[in-house]
Amino acid sequence: ILLITGYLNLICAKVVEKSDFESAESGDGILYQKVVSYISEHFREDITLRELSAKFGYNAKYLSHSLHTLTGIHFSKLLAMYRIEYAKKLITGNPSYSISKTALESGFSAINTFNRSFKELTGMTPSEYRDNSSAAKSSVE
């Protein structure tokens, strides 16, 4: 779990590097930090933009627009990035896990959404990723 948490923090750092906001102390910068921190801790739960905006006291459209302006990434994609990175760790760490179990443990409620997001973000299906990971481990051993 610590390794996964560390890896997810690296993702967060990469998103921050790509961000184009003037100051982390700006209102939107602080909001962004709060949102990313919350997502990094709760991505396996059912999080919606509406619930997140209510939690932080913002209009959902404003929150969505601010995140996209600061990062170039929409809320749903940011959430999917965290979930897919976690799923990749589950796949490589637990090759016997079924793809559907991996999807559910990563926070996805629908296997189709998981498969589509996984392919969009990695360029391969979860099964292909598992096969490639297994082949890479075999060639190292």
Which residues fall in each region the model found?
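Short, Lys/Arg-enriched, Trp-marked, Pro/Gly-tolerant hinge/linker segments that flank
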Residues: 1-4, 12-37, 41, 45, ...
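Terminal helix-turn-helix DNA-binding modules in bacterial transcription factors
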Residues: 37, 41, 46, 69-111, ...
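Core residues of bacterial helix-turn-helix
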Residues: 55-56, 67, 106-107, 118
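Short hydrophobic/aromatic patch on the recognition helix
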Residues: 62-63, 67, 71, 113-114, ...
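Short, solvent-exposed alpha-helical "recognition" segments
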Residues: 73-75, 123-126
